[in-house]
Regions:
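Conserved catalytic-core segment of nucleotide-activated headgroup transferases in glycan assembly
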Residues: 199-306
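A charged, aromatic-enriched C-terminal amphipathic alpha-helix characteristic of glycosyltransferases
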Residues: 195, 201, 206-207, 372-375, ...
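Short N-terminal targeting/anchoring amphipathic segment
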Residues: 91-97, 108-128, 144
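Active-site proximal beta-strand in glycosyltransferases
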Residues: 118-125, 133-152, 167-170
Length: 410
């Protein structure tokens, strides 16, 4: 068993995801002797962002960090594809896939990945990390599983990863009931709570010294930011369940006198028909509310300095306020969007229509302004202390949960 004064080699497998600078908190922790990051090949840019952050802000601790390109998703998917072509008597079993991996891969797992104090795998149902967790267990490796995004649709590898883990890190206790209903599994005895989306304490302290003036200081209007990788304008679109359909809420905000800044990579008709043309409802709103609705480039928050762009805004919208089918809504009820932490990190007050983020409404009412309509939002703004909207937890706290619990479980 590990002791409280021990130092650890920590090995992480899974997507890096947004805000790679979170890992600065790992490097900065005295208990971490070495962080081995096994990243998937489609995350080379995110990995490079971590390297750049370390070189810029913690060059003296670079020796504590090492990265390895792990072609795991590609290898798994190609093996599955080849076996599917050959097999005609039913679906391909996971044991068949695993037995067809090259010996050099298993040697790498045994000689490299297995040589660690804490093997940490995660975080969601679509990045193939749950499959790797299942394989790790079959090879006799103990691991910690962190989990964030999921759906109310049973997925065999997710269930196996949960069952086989030594313990699981969940964002909050609402996931316990979620998985009871989804799989009839009780995780109470092996679950601890910390959110993988908590942002870096080191970065927050660095930004706290920045002198950034709010845009509202210049024009006296409340500026609302929307961060969304993509938005759609077809209200009948089914694949995203209304998640990316922001037209109604933007129009309501504009009519109430707010200035809205939409930062997005892609504006399309729908996920089913991903085309762009004008006019569309978003460009029509720009014409109707000239100077009050701006469509802008995405803010690359992988670069710490770009938080200063986000810090100019007063309010940050968490979701479109439009629900969808049950399997999506069930997760949204317990979800804490990663944008919530981005906004708090930048001194932006998170706002959300009522009824969507039900867990947050019951537990985060002091950190989010929930409103039934935009006129109520306007009234609520007169009652709050904007300076009180600050993050309560950081990735350093996530790491502490991971290491403290590892001392008891591993």
């Amino acid at each position: 068993m590990m002791g409280p004064n021990d130092s650890y080699t920590l090995s992480r497998i899974g997507i890096i995801g947004v805000a790679p600078h979170r890992f600065l908190d790992v490097i900065n922790d005295e208990r971490v002797e070495k962080l081995n990051l096994y990243y998937f090949e489609n995350e080379k840019n995110a990995y490079n962002s971590i390297v750049n952050c370390i070189e810029k802000y913690m060059p003296d601790k670079k020796k504590k960090f090492e990265g390895f390109d792990l072609p795991w998703p590609t290898m798994y998917n190609l093996t599955l594809m080849e076996l599917s072509k050959q097999k005609t008597d039913g679906p391909v079993m996971s044991s068949e896939i695993f037995s067809n991996f090259p010996n050099v891969f298993y040697k790498f797992v045994k000689d490299q990945i297995a040589c660690t104090d804490v093997l940490w795998i995660g975080d969601n149902d679509f990045d193939t990390s749950f499959i790797f967790a299942t394989l790790s267990s079959m090879l006799g490796l103990d691991y910690v599983l962190s989990l964030k995004e999921t759906r109310f649709v049973p997925y065999g590898f997710e269930l196996e990863a949960l069952k086989r883990s030594k313990f699981v890190i969940l964002p909050h206790d609402g996931y316990i009931d979620f998985f009871k209903r989804k799989y009839s599994i009780n995780l109470e005895k092996k679950a601890v709570f910390a959110d993988i989306d908590w942002r870096s304490k080191f970065v927050y302290d660095f930004l706290s010294n920045s002198k950034v003036e709010k845009l509202s200081k210049k024009d006296g209007k409340n500026h609302v930011v929307i961060l969304s990788g993509r938005v759609v304008w077809n209200s009948e679109e089914t694949r995203s369940q209304g998640r990316y359909y922001y037209v109604p809420i933007i129009q309501e905000l504009l009519e109430e006198g707010f200035v809205v800044h939409l930062h997005t990579k892609v504006i399309i008709e729908s996920l089913d028909n991903p085309v762009y043309y004008e006019p569309n409802p978003y460009t029509e709103l720009m014409k109707k509310f000239q100077g009050s609705f701006l469509i802008e480039r995405p803010i690359d928050l992988n670069d710490v300095e770009n938080y200063k762009l986000l810090m100019r805004y007063d309010l940050g919208l968490l979701n479109s306020g439009i629900g969808g089918k049950d399997e999506f809504n069930e997760f949204e009820k317990i979800n804490v969007p990663n944008r919530f932490y981005e906004y708090l990190h930048a001194g932006v007050v998170p706002i959300s229509p009522k009824g969507m983020l039900q867990y947050m409404e019951s537990k985060f009412s002091d950190q989010v302004l929930f409103f039934k309509d935009v006129s109520e939002l306007r009234s609520l703004l007169n009652t709050i202390d904007v300076g009180s909207y600050k993050p309560k937890n950081f990735f350093a706290d996530f790491l502490q949960t991971l290491l403290d619990t590892s001392e008891n479980f591993l």
